[in-house]
């Protein structure tokens, strides 16, 4: 697995220039002060923000290239993301949050639930499945967000301050 990120992303007066490559098995930490573009970079890889120029390529598949009008929808990318603070869908149950990625890929609810069972057990979420996100502690919500990011077996896992507020 290789991720090649060679792009510029512009948002208003902010411009982020990226020229990085990552290989399978690498663990990379992006560090910098507030407002330096760390989350923006992750959002571009996840497909939540389109690149302005350049390209983003994962295993020879172009995910985003403005010049060629190529943009793979975030739900179809082999990328999982855990947002800072979890960011669960408030109108969905915990189970619906966990299986969201599979459902977005047209997998039936019953099959998605079966596929999710291992993660549900590993993360200790069985008792929480019918609850709403507002009923969870910060750590519980973070575990749900991590399970949701892993459910599609992504090639790349992006973590935006995933340990903040995590229960011990």
Residue ranges of model-derived segments:
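The feature captures the beta-strand-to-loop junction immediately N-terminal to the Walker
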Residues: 31-33
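Hydrophobic anchor residue at the start of the ABC signature
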Residues: 146
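A short, proline-enriched helix->beta-strand linker immediately N-terminal to the Walker B motif
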Residues: 151-155
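Conserved ABC ATPase signature
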Residues: 132-136, 140
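Catalytic Walker B motif of ABC-type/P-loop ATPase nucleotide-binding domains
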Residues: 157-161
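Short coil-to-helix segment of the ABC ATPase nucleotide-binding domain corresponding to the Q-loop/switch region
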Residues: 92-101
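Conserved ABC ATPase "signature" region
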Residues: 61-66, 103, 110-127
């Amino acid at each position: 697995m290789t991720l090649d990120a060679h792009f510029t992303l512009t948002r208003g007066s902010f411009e982020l220039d990226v020229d990085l490559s990552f290989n399978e098995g690498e663990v990379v930490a992006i560090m910098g002060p507030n407002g330096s573009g760390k989350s923006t970079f992750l959002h571009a890889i996840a497909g939540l923000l389109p690149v302005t120029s350049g390209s983003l390529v994962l295993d020879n598949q172009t995910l985003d290239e403005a010049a060629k009008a190529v943009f793979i929808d975030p739900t179809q990318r082999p990328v999982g993301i855990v947002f800072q603070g979890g960011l669960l869908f408030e109108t969905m149950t915990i189970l619906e949050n966990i299986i969201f990625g599979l459902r977005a890929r047209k997998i039936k609810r019953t099959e998605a639930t079966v596929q999710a069972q291992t993660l549900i057990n590993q993360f200790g979420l069985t008792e929480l499945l019918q609850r709403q996100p507002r009923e969870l502690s910060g750590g519980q919500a973070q575990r749900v967000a991590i399970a949701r990011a892993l459910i599609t077996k992504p090639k790349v896992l992006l973590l935006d301050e995933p340990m903040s507020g995590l229960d011990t």
